[in-house]
Amino acid sequence: MHNLLYKSKGLATRWLTLIAFVFVCLLTHAQNAQSHNKQKDAEQLGKALEYFASQKYHECLLILQGLDKQYRLNPRYKAYLGVSYYYEWDYENAVKHLSVAIPKLVNFAPHERSFYYWALAESFFNLRHYEKAVPCYHEMLKLCYDKERAEAYYRLGFCYLFGEDWADAWSNFYAAQNSFRKYRPGEEPARMAQIGNMLKALNGKVANEALMHIGINEAKGK
């Protein structure tokens, strides 16, 4: 009986040792596989950056979409993801990612940030969320190059136009006209003609609005 018990204990010990050995082997294999996957994902992230820099936004998006599901991407890569969605005309996802990323990029280069604000503003604009687009265009104007200002003023003109804010629409179309003339002379003849027509059409509305405002003030004064 004692010998049988001893043999049973010995057999159990050998089984436990074997199980432990197999577990360690599996754990080591899993760790090695995990390490390999992380290295592969890091290489994929590098490829995404290369695609983004070369303006291959579709390819960049395919990589970042997958990585975004597995990791917590840093704000810059979140911004890259948002911009890639913008260029794929997926404006809702562009807004989702850029809105999260931009506030965390305050220490980045001004022009880089202006580009993200532009993509966010354009996404809101294309979704017809004009009121939300306005502050984004204004933030872009604080950071962008002078030659880029005309586009923002032009879009702001339409944002205010669609909101029937005639005076601000006129002011921004006028600013766009001046910016095109000063920083991009002769580049956008069709756009300049359109802006000229918009200003003419708005002149009457702005004048009528001013007259109504004066009339209201005079009535209050009496």
Where do the language-model regions lie?
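Alpha-helical segment of the N-proximal tetratricopeptide repeat
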Residues: 42-66
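TPR/TPR-like (Sel1-like) alpha-helical repeat modules
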Residues: 161, 166-184
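Terminal, low-structured helical/coil segments at or just beyond the last alpha-helical repeat
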Residues: 179-222
